[in-house]
């Protein structure tokens, strides 16, 4: 996604505090936060439905993409274009205004965090959730900084608030399914 929202940030802090109080160390607490606060509720349900619809689960030889959030969590790396929560006028930043590509502060943040993070991966499938994140990753790819990773552009944001999600998914599903099928998994 573009950035963690207020609710995700709040949930993450709560999970971190509980993890530490339960005796987990720093690394385990952070893993616990990531596992339990990534795409919760209907967003996770919608995401899994679309990923399974593209047969990602079959490509990964798992029963369902839902297991990426549980027993097969080691196959999944989640991140945001902007690593830290961003707010505009007291609300979650949606990525539309200002454009993160045209705003020098936001673009610098993306280059400092996301581009560096992407450089750690090679031949991985990157699934940008939503139009703005697709545009960001397309720009990073144009700049030659995507490191041979496969970009699954056209994937809609799984939020229930995205009323065009199903239509967008149907329009792009054959192209996305082909990319997944042709993807050479490099562990």
What are these regions (language model features)?
Residues 2-127, 132-140, 150-153, 160-164, ...:
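A polyanion-binding, active-site-adjacent surface
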